[in-house]
């Protein structure tokens, strides 16, 4: 389950996790950023990865990467998916990064679902000057969600909701 949006992604993941845990469904969680420790980004079977597990994953990724350029977020995401491959029966709750279209988390061919939390004007400065508007943010966050069932949370305006519906339909 991919969670995209501007605000509410982490709390949505925590709510989904609580619901699935109550139903005895095992989950993996990938979030960003972290608050206290990088380990909190990685949860498998209700447990954060410990330092040794994380270091081992980083070493494996570094070895496989062959000194190719890679961002910090791509390393973390690769570590998550590498570990998640050991828990294939679990549901993955994945918080996307800044935008979804070119995000490192956007590698799955299908999703059980995608959840669009509230969309806002944060991160406009990451867009080209002539594209700094809410429609472009919506496009960047939702245009690649066409491979799954899409759930749209209540938005701050009808215009945003309508724009999301237009892009994902």
Outline where the language-model segments fall.
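Glycine- and other small-residue-rich loops at beta-strand/loop junctions that grip anionic moieties
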Residues: 5, 73, 153-155
